[in-house]
């Protein structure tokens, strides 16, 4: 069991490139933190710094309150699970899991006990004598996890461990990782570019962009109250709809002149962006309090079974408006729909991409989150 603390962690390479800009983060004992972001955002560099594989340029890294900046990887009591499994092909499943314990000089009886217990935990009992080439992708990943679990580390680090698996196996292993982490209670940091993994696994989510932490919080808090346009666009599939708007008294104005009544705090005439998620665009007849009603034309439909995605156009606006409809909806291409923008689900972002507080609504959201 362990806590992690990162204070002002910076990583700058000799060529002048800065990969991490003053990262501050605390991870509680037994917590599973997922770090998510696009390629090049710094998430893998952060993981390597935690593991001791990259030196820190500035700042302090502490495990259980102890500074570990200069501590060698082997002395940090951390176990990593990689995307490429990192198994020894000439060793059996049992041999792969026992390897680190043998190197430590652990007694043979203790090794046998831990191998048996770990194999039972992961459902590998019948595979202990097989070689990695005789295993499926999911089985190999379980062996890789077993090799980490058997060491009984203070901290787990996961480096995109499901990237090489097909969609069905990813779902299965996602559930398995979450179950095991909760059962074992080991503090974990999980890096991924997959937002579904991030949303479903995390106790808390850290969204990174360009070496900065954009936002940190519970998955649903970030989904419902993104601090920046980047977070709003990165979380959610399909992504949040964005419309260019101009601030005016009592709300914002769309490029086609339509007014949207919102309690946003923006100076008159400021350029901004209005955001709303596809599932929150509803037909006007089904809406409650609406900020505006938009008449759109359906240009393309994507039936997904339970849902149908409608790609619509609003006159005078170049971007799509994507609407998530019920799968049984009788929408057809070329049809006109009247859509309501519910006030409670509208987001306004300023020219810098920061979320603009809504008068009254922010207080209500803060109280609801307590």
Swiss-Prot record:
Pfam families, alphabetized: ABC_tran, OB_MalK
Superkingdom, natural source: Bacteria
Subcellular location: Cell inner membrane
InterPro entries per UniProt: AAA+_ATPase, ABC_transporter-like_ATP-bd, ABC_transporter-like_CS, ABC_transpr_MalK-like, ABC_transpr_MalK/UgpC-like, Mo/tungstate-bd_C_term_dom, NA-bd_OB-fold, OB_MalK-like
Transmembrane portions of the chain: none
Domain ABC transporter residue range list: 4-235
Iron-sulfur in keyword set: no
GO molecular function annotations of the record: ABC-type glycerol-3-phosphate transporter activity; ATP binding; ATP hydrolysis activity
CC per GO annotation: ATP-binding cassette (ABC) transporter complex, substrate-binding subunit-containing
Primary location class: membrane
Keyword annotations of the record: ATP-binding, Cell inner membrane, Cell membrane, Membrane, Nucleotide-binding, Sugar transport, Translocase, Transport
Binding site for ATP: 37-44
Reaction(s) catalysed (UniProt annotation): sn-glycerol 3-phosphate(out) + ATP + H2O = sn-glycerol 3-phosphate(in) + ADP + phosphate + H(+)
Protein topology in the membrane: Peripheral membrane protein
E.C. designation(s): 7.6.2.10
GO biological process: one example: glycerophosphodiester transmembrane transport
Known function: Part of the ABC transporter complex UgpBAEC involved in sn-glycerol-3-phosphate (G3P) import. Responsible for energy coupling to the transport system.
Similarity field: Belongs to the ABC transporter superfamily. sn-glycerol-3-phosphate importer (TC 3.A.1.1.3) family.
Quaternary structure annotation from Swiss-Prot or TrEMBL: The complex is composed of two ATP-binding proteins (UgpC), two transmembrane proteins (UgpA and UgpE) and a solute-binding protein (UgpB).
Protein name in UniProt: sn-glycerol-3-phosphate import ATP-binding protein UgpC
Source species: Chromohalobacter salexigens (strain ATCC BAA-138 / DSM 3043 / CIP 106854 / NCIMB 13768 / 1H11)
């Amino acid at each position: 069991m362990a806590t992690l603390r990162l204070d002002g962690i910076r990583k700058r390479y000799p060529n002048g490139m800065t990969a991490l800009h003053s990262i501050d983060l605390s991870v509680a004992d037994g917590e599973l933190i997922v770090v998510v972001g696009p390629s090049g955002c710094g998430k893998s560099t952060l993981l390597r710094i935690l593991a001791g594989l990259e030196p820190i340029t500035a700042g302090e890294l502490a495990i259980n309150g102890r500074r570990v900046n200069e501590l060698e990887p082997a002395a940090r009591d951390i176990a990593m699970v990689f995307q490429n499994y990192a198994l020894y092909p000439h060793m059996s499943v049992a041999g792969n899991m026992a390897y680190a314990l043998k190197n430590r000089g652990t007694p043979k009886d203790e090794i046998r006990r831990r191998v048996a217990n770990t194999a039972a935990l992961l459902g590998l009992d019948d595979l202990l004598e097989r070689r990695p080439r005789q295993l499926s992708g999911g089985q190999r990943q379980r062996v890789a996890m077993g090799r980490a679990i058997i060491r009984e580390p203070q901290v787990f680090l996961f480096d995109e461990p499901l990237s090489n698996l097909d969609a069905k196996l990813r779902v299965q292993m996602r559930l398995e990782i979450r179950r095991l982490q909760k059962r074992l209670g080991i503090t974990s940091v999980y890096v991924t570019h997959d937002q579904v993994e991030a949303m479903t696994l995390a106790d808390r989510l850290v969204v990174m962009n360009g070496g900065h932490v954009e936002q940190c919080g519970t998955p649903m808090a970030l989904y419902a109250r993104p601090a920046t346009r980047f977070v709003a666009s990165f979380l959610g599939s399909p992504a949040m709809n964005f419309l260019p708007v101009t601030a005016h008294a009592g709300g914002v104005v769309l490029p086609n002149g339509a007014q949207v009544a919102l309690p946003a705090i923006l100076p008159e005439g400021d350029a901004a962006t209005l955001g709303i998620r596809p599932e929150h665009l509803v037909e006007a007849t089904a809406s409650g309090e609406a900020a505006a009603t938009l008449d759109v034309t359906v240009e393309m439909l994507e039936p997904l079974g339970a849902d149908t995605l409608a790609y619509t156009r609003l006159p005078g606006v170049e971007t799509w408006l994507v609407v998530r409809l019920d799968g049984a909806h009788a929408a057809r291409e070329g049809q006109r729909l009247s859509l309501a923008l519910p006030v409670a689900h509208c987001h306004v972002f300023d020219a810098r991409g920061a979320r603009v507080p809504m008068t009254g609504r922010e207080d209500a959201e803060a109280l609801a989150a307590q």
